[in-house]
Amino acid sequence: MMTAATTALVTGATAGLGRAVAGALAGQGMRVLVHGRDAKRAASVVDEITKSGGAARAVLADLASLQQVRELADWVNADQGAITLLVNNAGIGAGRPPYRKRQLSADGHELRFAVNYLAPALLARRLVPPLKKGAPARIVNIGSVGQAPVDLADLRMDNHYTGAEAYYRSKFALAAFTFDLAEELAGSGITVNCLHPASLMNTHMVRESLIPPMSSVATGVKAVMNLATGPDGGTVTGRYFDGMNEARAHPGTYDPVTRSRLRAVTAELLDPFLRDSGRQASR
């Protein structure tokens, strides 16, 4: 288990699973950077943690903007120096039925692909330096059992769109990225894993879809903590978990050609935000 006085960044930590994970990490003695878009909601989580004897700080960024993702990472690097855990939890679900309303991000990408995949991929890459300084360190990507291959010729889903399909594609991409990054960081002291925490937890994301919840947030927290601070997350890397158990992601996420093509497209989209900008964000 990770020791006290280490720092974790949890994205999407103002509600649902992310909020509960932030509290659990603080309860284990970690300093938690509570990410959100809304200052009041983030402050509420920080207040809740500090009143319970934990240490936390709010950090704000809209993950639909890759520039804001870069600024968040640059601030963490400059202000914290070293961190030991990144939990890429923030995400957008399928939406409300009939799931037909497509939205684009600030950068013109399909919104779920941007927030659920491009943002965590960029954040993880830009935080490699402080994670190496904090090693042994971990990256935990919150995925889903719902995964579908990405149509690289139609990333914005101009030809056919449903929120559910967009969500599944984003989680496919995140799993494939997890495996790629784990290979790249082998031997660095950073483990990278992905998990489906629990099926249809009682969260706003699930309730919005009008599907009855099937499991509790507490069940999901237990699975996340297994990889975030427990034994599994420190001994394996490049793996996919379904709850507490190692499992197999979509077969396509293991295909070398598929991953190579996705990696190339992702690199092209993220390259402008991976270059050093000379700017530091203030939080």
Q: Residue spans of the language-model regions?
A:
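Canonical Rossmann dinucleotide-binding motif of NAD(H)/NADP(H)-dependent dehydrogenases/reductases
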Residues: 2-33
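Conserved glycine-rich Rossmann-like NAD(P)H-binding loop of the short-chain dehydrogenase/reductase
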Residues: 28-44
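Catalytic loop of short-chain dehydrogenase/reductase
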Residues: 91-113, 132-188, 196-211
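C-terminal helical subdomain
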Residues: 211-249, 254-264, 268, 272-275
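A glycine-rich helix->loop->beta "capping" turn
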Residues: 52-55, 75-88, 94, 103-104
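The beta1-alpha1 cofactor-binding region of Rossmann-like NAD(H)/NADP(H)-dependent oxidoreductases
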Residues: 39-40, 59-74
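Conserved active-site helix of classical SDR/Rossmann-fold NAD(P)-dependent CH-OH oxidoreductases
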Residues: 23, 121, 172-179, 183, ...
